[in-house]
């Protein structure tokens, strides 16, 4: 396979996608979708202590796995594929992975060069000294979902064509709405508060988000484990969608404690009858089955589903074909939601949903499309049905004299 050169990317016209794309991508195609990668081992015994102009400290199994998982995460949602060219290789390689110390990384957590930037395009460097001492003892967790763990996916995304929401990029791409070159890049979440976890991991607004979804310190949990819904849309604009991801009957279980590795995931699921499950929760849960809108609104990057007090859960990516943002592709749909043992809030979508509240004083919203089943349980449940022509919902488990049925309008 020949080296994939960088090609220019047209703007999508969507403020979030254009706010994350740097202007170029690798020149892959449906017939030739892959780029090659190599891990650079320890360079101490090489001439000048460098490989390709940079030193490297080698890779632990955990570090290597974080980048392998990051590549798989991109392949799961997009048409881009990755081929292992073997370690310390410079033949037909687009992505070069290095680990550096604080001095060589110039104090940053890591850095990467986007396609089309310069001769170092595709280089990804991780600053190991941010999370490990010089005698190889851990300083901070790099588990997925941790403050430092997201660095690996973040830098890889740069190397395939994504930028920060607060930057203008190689081709003067727009920033996210509400951001300027004078914005505080660590605190300003912009208009609609989308420049933050859990909506994009390309942001610098992580522990500074103060949005209730993530911790306010560099914790070992609570941040994105995967691509955010906005990242997914941007990658799909660059490389197309993966129409075959998670096509079976999948259950997405809400995390129920703030332990190491708890975090946020954006769901891209293209088939089967699927469910977000909070059935083991003792605390109230919110489960919202609606997709990220990608519109200029607070739900552009998704509607978070989580257990109360837990920094982690799910959003659901925008349902589209990677070309036309205005049409639902009928692919990324989660049909069912199950609550727990407290007062839960379950919200359906345009599909035929089964919303099961179980115990507690639950509030269930249905009737947005399809043939919904709203199932209560012991408690003072509320059942709200969309008051539009064609709405349909079956209500079960209404406790006489306790529960109530109402109608709501979404537009």
Predicted features, each with a name:
Residues 34-36, 40, 44-45, 187-190, ...:
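GD-rich hexapeptide-repeat beta-solenoids
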Residues 38-42, 113-143, 201, 311, ...:
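Active-site scaffold of zinc-dependent metalloenzymes
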Residues 55, 137-152, 170-188, 194, ...:
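Acidic, glycine-rich calcium-binding repeat modules characteristic of RTX/beta-roll
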Residues 77-79, 156-173:
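Catalytic Zn2+-binding segment of zinc metalloproteases
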Residues 99-125, 188, 195:
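Catalytic zinc-binding patch centered on the HExxH motif and its immediate surroundings
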Residues 292, 296-364, 368-369:
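Extracellular repeat-rich scaffold modules on cell surfaces
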